[in-house]
């Protein structure tokens, strides 16, 4: 709070050990993670002032995202695109705030993000959830448009399953989450060496990112969580086996 917010309310991405600002970015992911931290602190400590701060910052995030020109566009106007990342993280962010404090905007945001994932990012023709699509969800046949990020997709299935649990295991949400999880596991699991790899191309071309075949820790841990949620939702032994498979691999390597 003391060192990481600029005068415009946007967070710095990087500061020195003394709090001197070094870098700002065009995203609001730092704000989302700050909101989650404030919410969890409020729940753990009982200090409701942090729940109120979390809600206020969440509303600020929404204002940043809806104010034309406040956040620098990733692409020039020739490319009108939507990104999966912010759509997905807002589900979890709103969910964590809701656990600390009530406000109708939280349910509204979750519903809007869920609808956007279903409408724009799920592409059955590739059996994949894509990271970047056109403004109306159309497939963009470029290196970036073909990217599948199995970790992000599995994380999304976790968030949707968590919301399904909140809604007494809503069947439609469970169905959507399991579809994403099953597809993403198929794309991401390394059948030879185990673990979830970073990136795939939905047309099976070589993925552009240099780290495409690496296995960072976070896709593994999110797969551990998502598969356990899937088992809780369905009691299907398949998901328990997947949970054991990714858990064994993760704890053996990290």
Model-found features: residue ranges?
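Glycan-recognition and catalytic cores of secretory/periplasmic carbohydrate-active enzymes
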Residues: 1-254
């Amino acid at each position: 709070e003391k060192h990481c917010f600029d005068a415009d309310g946007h967070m710095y991405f990087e500061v020195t050990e003394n709090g001197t600002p070094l870098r700002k970015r065009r995203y609001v992911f730092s704000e989302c993670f700050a909101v989650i931290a404030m919410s969890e602190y409020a729940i753990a400590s009982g200090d409701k002032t942090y729940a109120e701060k979390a809600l206020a910052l969440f509303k600020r995030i929404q204002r940043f995202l809806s104010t034309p020109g406040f956040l620098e566009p990733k692409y020039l106007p020739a490319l009108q695109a939507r990104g999966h990342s912010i759509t997905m993280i807002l589900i979890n962010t709103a969910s964590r705030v809701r656990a600390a404090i009530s406000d109708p905007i939280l349910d509204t945001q979750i519903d809007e993000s869920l609808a956007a994932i279903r409408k724009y990012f799920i592409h059955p023709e590739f059996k994949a959830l894509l990271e970047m699509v056109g403004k109306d969800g159309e497939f963009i046949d470029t290196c970036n448009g073909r990217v599948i990020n199995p970790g992000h997709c599995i994380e999304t299935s976790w968030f949707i399953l968590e919301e399904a649990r909140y809604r007494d295991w809503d069947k439609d949400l469970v169905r959507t989450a399991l579809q994403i999880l099953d597809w993403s596991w198929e794309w991401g699991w390394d059948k030879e060496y185990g673990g979830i790899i970073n990136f795939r191309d939905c047309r099976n071309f070589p993925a552009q990112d240099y780290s495409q075949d690496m296995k960072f820790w976070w896709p593994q841990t999110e797969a551990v969580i998502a598969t356990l949620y899937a088992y809780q939702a369905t009691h299907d032994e398949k998901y328990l086996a997947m949970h054991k498979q990714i858990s064994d691999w993760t704890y053996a390597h990290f």
